Amino acid sequence: MYLIPTVIEQTNRGERAYDIYSRLLKDRIIFLGSPIDDQVANSIVSQLLFLAAEDPEKDISLYINSPGGSITAGLAIYDTMQFIKPDVSTICIGMAASMGAFLLAAGAKGKRFALPNSEVMIHQPLGGAQGQATEIEIAAKRILFLRDKLNRILAENTGQPIEVIERDTDRDNFMTAQKAQEYGIIDRVLTRLEDK
């Protein structure tokens, strides 16, 4: 278990204590720093919707340090990023792997970044099935459908041909921040916040 830091803010009406994530949200910063499951996706989606309703013209920054996770949960975040009016800028800190890399590439064009020592990893969806042969067949068809959908979206977001995406996601494919820029997952490597 880890401790969530609290920030004390002085105002003319006194002191106010925020958990760090609530304080960042005031500056339109969302932090994805865990594996992606339904609970995490619901939190990210609700923050995106809140910020979009609060000011539909102002960018939102999504900082990503995630090993990936559930495809359906990740697609809920992805669809919301595309659905809302504000641009969502994505910034990789540490690692953006699997669905984390998918979301990194889904940021607004020209506003996708990574810090110099961060790492990006893309691969095909993982899954397993057990049970009767027909259940295994259904699961296999679904994972192939999801793989094709994710590859198509990743090709659109990176500018890579679908054949290149299919080849490069066949196994775990790790990239430095610089390589992720060359590949089209990000637009620029940031060394200072002002560079953004």
Curated annotation (Swiss-Prot):
Keywords: Cytoplasm, Hydrolase, Protease, Serine protease
Major location (coarse): cytoplasm
Location of the active site: 98, 123
EC number in record: 3.4.21.92
Biological process annotations from GO: protein quality control for misfolded or incompletely synthesized proteins
Matches recorded under InterPro entries: ClpP, ClpP/crotonase-like_dom_sf, ClpP/TepA, ClpP_His_AS, ClpP_Ser_AS
Its biological purpose: Cleaves peptides in various proteins in a process that requires ATP hydrolysis. Has a chymotrypsin-like activity. Plays a major role in the degradation of misfolded proteins.
GO molecular function: ATP-dependent peptidase activity; ATPase binding; serine-type endopeptidase activity
Alphabetical list of CDD domains matching this protein: S14_ClpP_2
UniProt keyword Cytoplasm present: yes
Name of protein: ATP-dependent Clp protease proteolytic subunit
Quaternary structure and partners: Fourteen ClpP subunits assemble into 2 heptameric rings which stack back to back to give a disk-like structure with a central cavity, resembling the structure of eukaryotic proteasomes.
Family: Belongs to the peptidase S14 family.
